[in-house]
Amino acid sequence: MALDPADQHLRHVEKDVLIPKIMREKAKERCSEQVQDFTKCCKNSGVLMVVKCRKENSALKECLTAYYNDPAFYEECKMEYLKEREEFRKTGIPTKKRLQKLPTSM
C-alpha cells in the first residue's frame, strides 16, 4: 500500500514533534541577533551566566515565543513539512540526502 504524496493528513508525531522542530530551527534563524547576544554573554560570563545574562535570555525567549505563538508561522512551517514529505513520498529520498552534493569522479 503506497502512501499518497498529496495527502495532507498529519499524524500526531508530525504535529507534535516534526513541525515544532522546523519551527524551532526557523525561529532561531529569525532571532539570530538575540541568539548571538545570548551566546556571547554566556561565553563571557562563565559560571555567573545565569545571573549576568538574564536580559539577553529574556530577549531571546520573547523573540522565540512570538514565533511559536504565531499561527501564520505554524502554517508556514506545516506547509514546508508537507512539501518535504510529499517529495519524499514521490522519490523515496530524504531531504537531507537530496540536498547533499553527489560525488564526482574526475
Curated annotation (Swiss-Prot):
Residue numbers of motif Cx9C motif 2? 53-63
Which residues does the UniProt record annotate as the domain CHCH?
28-71
Q: Which GO terms describe its cellular component?
A: mitochondrial matrix; mitochondrion
InterPro entries in the record: Cyt_c_biogenesis_Cmc1-like
Which cysteines link up through disulfide bonds?
31-63, 41-53
Give the motif span (Cx9C motif 1): 31-41
> Where are the coiled-coil regions?
none
State any single GO MF term: metal ion binding
**Function comment:** Component of the MITRAC (mitochondrial translation regulation assembly intermediate of cytochrome c oxidase complex) complex, that regulates cytochrome c oxidase assembly.
Q: What family does this belong to?
A: Belongs to the CMC family.
What is the protein's name according to its record?
Answer: COX assembly mitochondrial protein homolog
The species this protein belongs to is Homo sapiens
Q: What is the lineage of its organism?
A: Eukaryota, Metazoa, Chordata, Craniata, Vertebrata
The gene is: CMC1
